[in-house]
């Protein structure tokens, strides 16, 4: 069964990589936001995340990578947030695109530092 609409993975860590692999198995393609361009370029070159789960291979032709969070949000129907909890606020501050009509999924776990918020 293929998942409907365009799905975005928001984060580039090991948890995001694992979720991206699962979602891509059920989708034609995905959008993937990572904050670092150097990691994106290395991922494209190697076919896997250079920093996390390096044995997990991806079909790079089916992934639209970008370090522009607003571009990824605009081009997606569903946003799966998988950023580490300490970076949640900094990522959301960059967000200028409206998310009102988006389907939001959070796979964030942990505590937001300085605020003791559990997510």
Short names for language-model regions:
Residues 37, 72, 111:
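Residue-level detector of flexible, active-site-proximal loop/helix-junction positions
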């Amino acid at each position: 069964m293929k998942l409907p609409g365009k799905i975005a993975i928001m984060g580039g860590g090991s948890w995001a990589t694992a979720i991206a692999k699962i979602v891509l198995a059920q989708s034609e393609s995905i959008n993937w936001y990572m904050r670092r361009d150097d990691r994106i370029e290395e991922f494209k070159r190697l076919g896997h995340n250079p920093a996390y789960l390096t044995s997990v291979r991806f079909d790079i032709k089916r992934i639209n990578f970008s370090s522009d969070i607003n571009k990824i949000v605009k081009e997606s129907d569903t946003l799966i947030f998988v950023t580490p909890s300490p970076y949640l606020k900094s990522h959301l501050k960059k967000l200028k695109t409206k998310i009102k009509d988006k389907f939001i999924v959070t796979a964030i776990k942990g505590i937001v530092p300085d605020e003791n918020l559990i997510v």
